[in-house]
Amino acid sequence: TVDCSDYPKPVCTLEEMPLCGSDNKTYGNKCNFCNAVVDSNGTLTLSHFGKC
C-alpha cells in the first residue's frame, strides 16, 4: 500500500519510481499517484509497483 495522507502536493518532482494504479495507468512516482488518489476521492488504488 501507499500512504497518501500528506497529499495532495502542489508540485511533484520528476523522480522516476513508477506505480500502476487500479485504473491501469502508470504514474511516474508516488506524488503523482497520490495526487490522483486524492482527486479520485479514494476510488483509485495501487495495483502494483512498477509500470502497468
Swiss-Prot record:
SMART domains in UniProt: KAZAL
InterPro entries per UniProt: Kazal-type_SerProtInhib, Kazal_dom, Kazal_dom_sf
Disulphide bonds in the chain: C4-C34, C12-C31, C20-C52
Marked site (Reactive bond 3) residue numbers: L14, E15
GO molecular function, one term: serine-type endopeptidase inhibitor activity
GO cellular component terms, A-Z: extracellular region
Intracellular or extracellular location(s): Secreted
Kazal-like domain ranges (all copies): 2-52
Pfam families membership: Kazal_1
Keywords tagged on the record: Disulfide bond, Glycoprotein, Protease inhibitor, Repeat, Secreted, Serine protease inhibitor
Glycosylated residues (UniProt): N41
CDD domains reported for this sequence: KAZAL_FS
Record note on domains: Avian ovomucoid consists of three homologous, tandem Kazal family inhibitory domains.
Record's protein name: Ovomucoid
